[in-house]
């Protein structure tokens, strides 16, 4: 909370170590997490008269299929790999014999270094069209330090001395506290 409420107290840092379950292997960063909710609205009607309604689940189903083949316009990162998109949940309707007037799904996007979440949002809005409303649930940027960084080189050298082998240069797909601490620490 200090990073959010009083960033001026954090000071500047030359390096940051975040404790994560990595089997004591140093990591160079993590992917970002961009979670969205996609909502479709319709008009309810009795299930025996669907022509009097507007089925929100049909709209949402088309959106889910469009998301399945969404292509990011950012190339894969050499260590982080490619950005990913997953539809995690879908909900809609109130019962079997009604045309649903609302439906929603959640989207979990994992981004690579320097990928712009606002740009992804705009691309998804264009892809899904005006029948789908997007809202942001979580927006956590990626964190990455190049393996050529002097401090990283020192860390890898110390690890090599103690472990007998130089650590592998890698990142992880989950996000860590480093994302929250990066901005206030400079």
Name each model feature, range by range:
Residues 18-21, 28, 35-186:
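Metal-dependent amide/peptide-bond hydrolase catalytic core
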């Amino acid at each position: 909370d200090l990073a959010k409420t009083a960033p001026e107290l954090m000071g500047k840092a030359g390096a940051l170590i975040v404790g994560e379950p990595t089997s004591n292997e140093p990591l160079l960063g993590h992917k970002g997490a961009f979670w969205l909710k996609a909502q479709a609205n319709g008009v309810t009607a009795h299930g025996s008269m669907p022509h009097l309604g507007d089925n929100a689940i049909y709209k949402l189903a088309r959106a889910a299929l469009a998301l399945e083949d969404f292509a990011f316009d950012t190339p894969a990162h050499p260590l982080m790999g490619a950005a990913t998109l997953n539809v995690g949940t879908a909900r809609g309707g109130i019962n079997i014999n009604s045309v649903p007037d609302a439906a929603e799904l959640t989207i979990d996007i994992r981004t690579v270094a320097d990928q712009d979440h606002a740009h992804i949002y705009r691309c998804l809005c264009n892809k899904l069209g005006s029948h789908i409303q997007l809202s942001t649930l979580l927006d956590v940027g990626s964190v990455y330090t190049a393996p050529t960084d002097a401090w990283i080189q020192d860390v890898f050298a110390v690890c090599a001395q103690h472990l007998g082998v130089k650590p592998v240069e890698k990142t992880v797909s989950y996000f860590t506290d480093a994302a929250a601490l990066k901005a206030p620490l400079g």
